[in-house]
Amino acid sequence: MPSVTCEQVVAVASDFLDDALDSTERANLDSHLSGCGNCPTYLGQLRTTIKVLSDRPSVEVPEELRAAIDQALSGTNDSEAAAAAYAQHGEHLYSIATAIAPREAEDIVESTFVRALEEGTAAFTRERLTEILVDIAETPDPGEGRVSSVYDHSGSADARVDSLDADADTAELFYPQFYSEGIDAGAFLESPNAWGESHMLSPEADVETDELYGLVDGALQDLSASDAAAVSLVDIEGISREVAAQQLNLSAEDISAALHRGRNHIRGALDGYLTPA
């Protein structure tokens, strides 16, 4: 059986936790985990990160968004169908939009329904609306396929264009570091921390919950649009990898990589908060 390093375990950790490895790959990792003091701790961090994401409180959809959509679609033949679709899927779409681009979430959702109406009522399914939303969110030019909400006075469209500038500064993402050579090649440079329970969620811990999800939301905003959408769809909304990949127009390998980057960055953002003092 080939020797597996900690670096190799981390590289496929998301696939391991999602049961996306074949039996041989899983057996190799299990063999390594049985004798490693660091990788089980790291995997525990990643499991907790995914659990925190799945428990993320539902976003509060602004009342103005419904009014903006009603105004944008008023007078159209299928406005009632659009209103029904918004009632059913609006919170889902707004949650994804806030993960991708929180300052433009309302514009993105509004534009989603405008485009769906252009396609016809068959587009008012959750799957198609999500696909349209992500496509709009990835559009560099707000003039191409996106409307500006009548309630938006923040200049957020310009901010979105700036954020997509290839020369703009991008956040440095958290990722474990490893020895590159010598007898310890592939081992963690610093052992992962065992996270405590003092800051984990509980019904009484409102302040701690706000702090925890403030870190999560900040980390999501550091990610690329497609990585943030992948994490939102799979870990927050609970959609399967396969459906998420289809909606984001990603291959199986690309959705795996997006989840890997996103989860590791959020894990890193939570590390200092969840590590006991």
What is each stretch, according to the model?
Residues E7-V9, N77, Q88, A166-A229, ...:
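Amphipathic alpha-helical segment used for protein-protein interaction
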